[in-house]
A protein has these predicted regions:
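Class I SAM-dependent methyltransferase SAM-binding "motif I" and its flanking Rossmann-like core
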Residues: 91-159
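A contiguous loop/helix-start segment that scaffolds small-molecule binding in enzyme catalytic cores
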Residues: 4, 11-13, 80-81, 158-176
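Loop/helix-junction capping segments adjacent to catalytic residues or to phosphate/diphosphate-binding pockets
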Residues: 22, 66, 92, 143-146, ...
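Glycine-rich beta-alpha junction loops
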Residues: 88, 141, 167-170
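Class I S-adenosyl-L-methionine
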Residues: 4-110, 121
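Positions that flank functional sites
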Residues: 47, 138, 171
Length: 176
């Protein structure tokens, strides 16, 4: 006999686009409107707060990603909650960590809402859309060893890929 898990509320992982509210998708905006609580990095919650002021906002500083995810899950146990990130939630966003922690919160239903990435938006803005093969590489060594970042850049360059660089102001970026 299988006993079901009671789903009390929902957690949305929402990519809010490249920073300009006009670039947020209709699906992302609809999900945010359904939520009572919006959790995110302080800079991102401040952007959304201007357009959806009647929500409860919970923010954490940079480098507190795991704490942010756990807070979002805690709120989602009783209220519809969104955890927001810039760009797409699956591209250097929060989706991976939220999924990794899901086993701790079986009674929370999880939905991931994609967003427009900075790479795609930037290409369009520059008049050089990414229409062929390309690579996206972060210069941050917080989660990826410096040597691996260098190897990825070399391999992408050897493959003649357009390379979209994320985190160009990372501490080690000048050395790469």
């Amino acid at each position: 006999m299988t006993i079901g898990v009671l789903i009390l509320a929902k957690l949305y992982v929402v990519g809010t686009g490249p920073g300009d509210i006009s670039k947020i998708t209709a699906e992302a905006l609809a999900a945010l409107k359904k939520c009572e609580v919006i959790v995110g990095y302080t800079v991102y919650t401040d952007i959304i707060k201007k357009f959806l002021p009647n929500k409860k906002y919970v923010s954490t500083p940079m480098t507190k990603e795991k704490d942010r995810c756990l807070l979002a899950y805690k709120y989602a146990e009783t209220e519809n909650t969104a955890i927001i990130c810039s760009g797409d939630a699956g591209v250097y966003g929060m989706a991976g960590l939220v999924i990794e922690l899901k086993h701790l919160f079986k009674n929370v239903e999880l939905t991931i809402i994609p967003g427009v990435t900075a790479a795609l938006s930037g290409g369009a803005l520059l008049g050089s859309p990414l229409t062929a093969d390309f690579a996206v590489i972060s210069l941050s060594d917080l989660l990826t060893p410096y040597e691996l970042i260098q190897k990825r850049i070399r391999c992408a360059a050897q493959g003649d890929f357009v390379i979209c660089i994320y985190n160009p102001s990372a501490k080690n970026a000048a050395d790469i």
